[in-house]
């Protein structure tokens, strides 16, 4: 892609998200979401591969439907209440419809079906943008509209996303689909606590972005898209395979890695709110996600020669990619747990 075109598209991504962040009017927030969608569509379709074009078409149709629903709901709310304020959704019908539209935007269960299929058709870097940056603007709107939304709906969305994200990832062999279901499960953890402690949602979102960035960038360096290609990574690059293993375990939420921090804080908050059943269900759904991360770790570290492998080994060539983003994201993914008290002080 032409570097000038790429610069314009990336600037538009930043502009759309910033516009949604800073707006208190539904029309401006909607415009920011649409700028985001229109900016990422050319990035998704740049490969000119049938799978990429199919994924782009699916993404565009789903996002257009969600945007139409947001515009319709905000207009209906303005007609009923006489205000366009983002935080002013007094009616249960409009607030529920808006929550489902935003859930469709970010791929929360049960509106999640498009996300694995779209992510599977993209290359890893575009998939990284879709899994991280594109979640920011809708999540900002969800945080602002939470106070007027029925708590039962938020709890149901959170449990369903965590459960489906863990359960559906168990039988996957494609790494991008596994990361898509991982994204759905992490979004469930954010939604479950958003009504009680929005600052914990922000912490969970931040750690998720760093962990997912580390996972995508590591797989990009390893040129891995399926589980059976991970089996040759240890002989090819032992250090990178060890780093990738720790990143996956961090995504699974094992201590003493960063991924344990949001799960620990969220379970603690749910227990404080006298919701032991919800906390227990969320802790059990985390085990489902942990299982398929352990599958990836097993493929990378324990399935080495002379064992039988089902994929041809790759030549080990010197990478020309910039390793700074990978280094930063891996460092944050592994070492943020001791800073938990400081992070809590900064966000509360």
UniProtKB/Swiss-Prot annotation:
UniProt lineage: Eukaryota, Metazoa, Chordata, Craniata, Vertebrata
Membrane spanning residue stretches: 1-21, 25-45, 60-80, 99-119, 124-144, 151-171, 178-197, 202-224, 239-259, 274-294, 326-346
Chief site of localization: mitochondrion
Catalysed conversion reaction: a ubiquinone + NADH + 5 H(+)(in) = a ubiquinol + NAD(+) + 4 H(+)(out)
GO biological process: mitochondrial electron transport, NADH to ubiquinone; mitochondrial respiratory chain complex I assembly
UniProt keyword list: Electron transport, Membrane, Mitochondrion, Mitochondrion inner membrane, NAD, Respiratory chain, Translocase, Transmembrane, Transmembrane helix, Transport, Ubiquinone
Classification via Pfam families: NADH_dehy_S2_C (PF06444), Proton_antipo_M (PF00361)
UniProt-listed PANTHER family: NADH-UBIQUINONE OXIDOREDUCTASE CHAIN 2
Subcellular location: Mitochondrion inner membrane
Cellular component, GO annotation: mitochondrial inner membrane; respiratory chain complex I
Protein name: NADH-ubiquinone oxidoreductase chain 2
Organism listed in the record: Danio rerio
Domain of life, source organism: Eukaryota
EC class (word): translocase
Subunit comment: Core subunit of respiratory chain NADH dehydrogenase (Complex I) which is composed of 45 different subunits.
Annotated GO MF terms: NADH dehydrogenase (ubiquinone) activity
Enzyme Commission identifier(s): 7.1.1.2
